[in-house]
């Protein structure tokens, strides 16, 4: 069985492909809840982040020094956006969870996540329209 690629790797790989069909096929071939949620964070106006905008002032880890992956923190995402769970923790705790996540994952993943939450993630050829075609019904607004 092939090793599961990180979302960052899938996005970078997809952006290097030449045709729209190849990009759609690659996104679909690497479909995961995390990939789709990162795409929704970035492109769906219905997904509203309740964290401060921008990259917090934290020391990011090189990939070899990272102690965790973005996947390991996936359950915390529900607290970072306007959801039914967001009100269950205090803003201070929410921000601390986010900072801890950023300090444990590789720098590339941390930067990707911060750009996606701010709706500023950009990869050549990966557009809202392309993602809507790859995953119909995923992006609501």
Feature names for model-found ranges:
Residues 1-141:
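N-terminal nucleic-acid-engaging modules of covalent nucleotidyltransferase systems
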């Amino acid at each position: 069985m092939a090793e599961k690629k990180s979302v960052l790797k899938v996005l970078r790989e997809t952006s290097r492909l030449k045709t729209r069909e190849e990009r759609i096929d690659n996104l679909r071939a690497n479909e995961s809840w995390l990939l789709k949620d990162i795409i929704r964070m970035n492109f769906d106006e219905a997904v509203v982040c309740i964290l401060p905008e921008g990259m917090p002032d934290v020391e990011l880890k090189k990939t070899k020094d990272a102690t965790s992956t973005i996947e390991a923190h996936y359950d915390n995402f529900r607290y970072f956006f306007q959801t039914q769970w967001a009100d269950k923790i205090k803003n201070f705790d929410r921000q601390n969870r986010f900072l801890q996540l950023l300090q444990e994952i590789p720098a590339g993943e941390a930067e990707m996540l911060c750009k996606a939450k701010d709706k500023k993630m950009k990869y050549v050829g990966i557009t809202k329209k392309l993602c809507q075609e790859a995953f119909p019904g995923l992006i609501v607004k």
